[in-house]
């Protein structure tokens, strides 16, 4: 991730002893300028153009599932100002276009969190579970013949005292022009649209298996999603939710998305498996075709677009 002024870029290092850290680099030399310790498994992050603070979710893959936090950092002094408790395995830290709110989803507790970027506290929480899915799950439980199976499930619930989401949301992206947000339901194979004014789910539409990251073109017309389990990238028209294209990525495990400022190209990081290199695929958003690829380091993950120079 980079700051809008372009002097520095930032990297979250998830693994630590036990905590991860945030590292600040110079864009001129790509050398480390500073670093600071965050929480357990820091992951996605973004800087608010209004507050100037950096908001990083602490995904926390360690031990039993429990509520984790969002770290708020002053990127100038590289000081963690505070940490805000949200849900279990928070991911997909994204800021509203006006810079006033930070959004993240809790993968294992199935919730959307809105944080007041100025007040530095949780403003609203939304349960993303589909009631129909819940009912189907209960019917499945009622149909179990073995009491041992029921006891086993009760034991799983009591281990950490938290619900286990069927949606398993992994990403949220606010619309650049409308008061809507879109969420990747990695477990339910869907995109969830949330009306931020009414604070409720306004639409759901199915995807391929395991949608992971989402991004919206700067002109607000297209939604791009990585379909991680299938190694594909999907493109939807946001006016009618129609699938415009589904592109097979160059290798397996599609991950991050960055879109050019002119809304013409999407850059997709693809992790690869085993000894394969990571790859960045370039997709033309006018023809919905893969136009180029470049090999990068193994297990390519986060990706950002800085600016377009002509």
Language model features with spans:
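Predominantly soluble domains enriched in secretory-pathway, periplasmic, or organellar proteins
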Residues: 3-310
């Amino acid at each position: 991730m980079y700051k809008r002024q372009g002097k520095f870029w930032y990297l979250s290092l998830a693994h630590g002893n036990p905590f991860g850290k945030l590292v600040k680099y110079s864009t001129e030399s790509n050398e480390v300028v500073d670093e600071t310790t965050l929480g357990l498994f820091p992951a996605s992050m973004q800087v608010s153009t209004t507050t100037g603070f950096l908001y990083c979710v602490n995904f926390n893959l360690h031990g039993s599932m429990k509520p984790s936090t969002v770290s708020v950092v002053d990127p100038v002094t590289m000081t963690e100002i505070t940490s805000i408790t949200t849900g279990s395995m928070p991911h997909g830290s994204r800021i509203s276009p006006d810079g006033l709110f930070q959004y993240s989803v809790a993968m294992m507790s199935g919730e959307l969190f809105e944080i007041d970027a100025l007040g530095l506290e949780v403003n609203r929480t939304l349960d993303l579970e589909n009631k129909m899915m819940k009912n189907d799950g209960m019917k499945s439980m009622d149909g179990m013949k073995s009491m041992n199976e029921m006891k086993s499930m009760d034991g799983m619930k009591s281990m950490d005292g938290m619900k286990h989401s069927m949606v398993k949301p992994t990403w949220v992206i606010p619309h650049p022009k409308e008061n809507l947000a879109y969420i990747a339901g990695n477990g339910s194979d869907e995109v969830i649209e949330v009306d931020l004014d009414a604070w409720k789910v306004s639409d759901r539409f199915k995807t391929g298996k395991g949608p992971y990251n989402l991004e919206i073109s700067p002109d607000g017309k297209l939604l791009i999603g990585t379909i991680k389990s299938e190694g594909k990238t999907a493109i939807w028209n946001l006016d009618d939710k129609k699938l415009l294209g589904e592109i097979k990525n160059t290798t397996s495990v599609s991950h991050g998305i960055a879109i050019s400022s002119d809304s013409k190209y999407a850059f997709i990081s693809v992790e690869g498996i085993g000894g394969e290199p990571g790859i960045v695929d370039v997709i033309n958003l006018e023809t919905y075709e893969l136009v180029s690829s470049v090999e990068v380091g193994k297990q390519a993950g986060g990706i950002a677009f800085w600016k377009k120079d002509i």
